[in-house]
Curated annotation (Swiss-Prot):
PROSITE patterns recorded: SMP
Protein name, UniProt field: Maintenance of mitochondrial morphology protein 1
Top-level taxon in the UniProt lineage: Eukaryota
UniProt note: domains: The SMP-LTD domain is a barrel-like domain that can bind various types of glycerophospholipids in its interior and mediate their transfer between two adjacent bilayers.
Lineage, opening ranks: Eukaryota, Fungi, Dikarya, Ascomycota, Pezizomycotina
Any GO BP: phospholipid transport
Membrane topology: Single-pass type I membrane protein
Disulfide bonds: none
Positions in the Cytoplasmic compartment: 47-536
Gene that this sequence comes from: MMM1
Matching InterPro entries: Mmm1 (IPR027537), MMM1_dom (IPR019411), SMP_LBD (IPR031468)
HAMAP family xref list: Mmm1
Residue numbers on the Lumenal membrane side: 1-25
Entry-linked Pfam families: MMM1
Length: 536
């Protein structure tokens, strides 16, 4: 029996060495993760870059890959222009096809349905149609118009003491034009002006398409109802009728008139028409009498020196505050006038044409006072003559088929009329609607009193009229009503519920406040005239 030493033991197993070390495997794993993340970012997050077009590839594009422009598309017969071709000076601006500017295209692109339901009338005259689109409210437009009118009233009140730019001077010069006034009428003196307190209300706006032989595809016209009532828009004048036979100034008959607008309502028509360039009249000239000198034109002529000085200061003033807003406005207006004057002859200029339909309503109140010793008050025949003359004046200017054409200003941004809102305006805007300090009659205890009450030292109105203080501006600002006094002691306000005719005969009742004048004294006609005799 063999011993344990003679037994052979099997050799130990040989351990195989790994081909890669631990460090190398870690690096390979990290690298694979980085590659996977990079591939994910490249193919799933970033898109494929578009191929760079070659220079010769621009002219070889097919029509399916070419972007079509609705307003600037080139006609089919014209060949495309490559970047290497230099455009000539005559075709830099791409033409606009007429199919993109006609009324049908405009209505389609603005999603407005204005298909007329009634056919047009004959004899080549357009007749207003009813639109299938629902009438729109004009509340936002009423606010803008009210702000504009309020600014005009404030400007007229601020310039009331100006010898040339005031509305009183403009009206006096227009009424006393020697070319228009007959020889038997003495100089006309404006005794009372009221610019009103209320604002016109526009409503029921609708856009219609009308036929126009001067426009391709017709033109669009906006119709809106306007109503102005319960206002004190009035004008009072004094003059004398002269009897020049058998010798000049043989007899003199004093006459006092006061015309007030009780109510106005009608349908306003607004449209844009291309002007003939140098002339403002785009329509056929009407056989109306020669154009009379209006108060607005005279006011513009008087303001020409101020506009020239403002235009000289405009290039050096690029910022403004609330104190020089009027100067910036005058500079902008002068800049627009210069731009229109530089336009070559024959270039059409877009204009705004507006008129009223013949079914308007204009109610007037005419008060008259005729005579010296024995005065006749409110003669019906005089009221009829004055009302007929005012109606004829209105119809000759703004009632269809006659229209008023106004050239649109240049709205291109210019540095001469660029301004920055002042810190004072921003502070007032954030103060919750507090009244600004520069508006007369809104600050202080001696300003305009509420209706039924009165400020200190005010003048008594009639009934529910407003009691206006005289310590501040000398008259109430809310009505913008002032009286041209021959003694030069300033104007006196009148209540909003009081007609202009009461200013002629002392119709205001009620006593004034402390320091104010009585109703009979402030509204009496200058001169020694006895009490009026009422005609029955």
């Amino acid at each position: 029996m063999a011993g344990p030493s003679n037994q052979t033991q099997p050799p130990p197993p040989v351990l195989t060495q790994p081909s890669l070390s631990f460090t190398q495997g870690l690096l390979v794993g990290q690298l694979s993760v980085v590659l996977l993340i990079g591939a994910f970012i490249k193919f799933f997050i970033f898109g494929e870059a578009p191929p760079h077009p070659s220079r010769n590839g621009l002219s070889n594009r097919t029509s399916s890959h070419r972007r079509s422009y609705s307003l600037n598309s080139i006609s089919a017969d014209s060949s495309p222009r490559t970047l290497r071709e230099k455009p000539s000076t005559s075709n830099i601006l791409r033409p606009v096809p007429s199919s993109s500017t006609n009324t049908r295209s405009i209505l389609r692109k603005t999603y407005y349905s204005a298909t007329p339901t009634n056919p047009t009338s004959k004899h080549s005259r357009s007749r207003p149609h009813h639109s299938s689109h629902q009438p729109e409210s004009l509340d936002w437009f009423n606010v803008l118009i009210a702000q504009t009118i309020a600014q005009y009233r404030q400007t007229a009140y601020i310039l009331k003491d100006s010898p040339t730019s005031s509305i009183l001077a403009s009206l006096s010069e227009a009424l006393n034009n020697p070319e228009k006034k007959p020889s038997f009428i003495d100089s006309i003196k404006v005794t009372d002006i009221s610019l009103g307190e209320e604002f016109p209300i526009f409503s029921n706006c609708r856009v219609i398409a009308v036929e126009d032989p001067n426009s391709d595809g017709g033109r669009l016209q906006a119709l809106m109802d306007v109503d102005l009532s319960d206002d004190n828009l009035s004008l009072a004048v004094e003059t004398s009728l002269l009897l020049n036979y058998p010798k000049p100034f043989s007899a003199v008959l004093p006459v006092a008139l006061a015309v007030s607008v009780v109510r106005f309502s009608g349908t306003l028509c607004i449209s844009f028409v291309p002007g003939p360039g140098t002339s403002d009249q785009t329509m056929s000239p009407s056989p109306s009498p020669p154009k009379e000198a209006s108060a607005e034109n005279i006011a513009v002529d008087h303001q020409s020196p101020e506009r020239q000085s403002a235009r000289q200061r405009a290039p050096h003033q690029h910022k403004y505050t609330n104190t020089n807003t009027a100067g910036a406005t005058a500079a902008a207006t002068a800049d627009d006038n210069d731009t229109h004057a530089k336009l070559p002859h024959g270039i059409p200029k877009t204009s705004l044409a507006f008129s009223f339909l013949p079914d308007y309503r204009l109610d007037l109140s005419v008060r008259s006072l005729i005579g010296s010793r024995s005065r006749l008050q409110d003669v019906p025949k005089v009221a009829q003559l004055v009302e007929a003359r005012v109606q004829a004046w209105f119809e000759e200017r703004v009632v269809e088929p006659r229209v008023q054409v106004v050239g649109l200003p240049n709205i291109w941004p210019r540095m001469g009329r660029t301004g920055v809102r002042g810190s004072q305006e921003e502070t007032e805007a954030g103060a919750g609607g507090s009244a600004p300090a520069d508006i007369p009659g809104t600050a202080g205890g001696d300003g305009v009193g509420v209706r039924g009450g009165g400020g200190g030292g005010g003048v008594g109105g009639s009934g529910g009229g407003s009691m206006r203080g005289t310590s501040g501006w000398g008259m109430g600002y809310d009505g913008l009503r002032y009286r041209h006094n021959a003694h030069g002691d300033g104007g006196v306000g009148a209540g909003p519920g009081q007609s202009a005719g009461a200013a002629l005969y002392g119709g205001a009742q009620g006593g004034g406040g402390g320091g104010g004048r009585g109703g009979e004294e402030q509204f009496a006609i200058p001169g020694s005239m006895p009490d009026p005799v009422v005609v029955t």
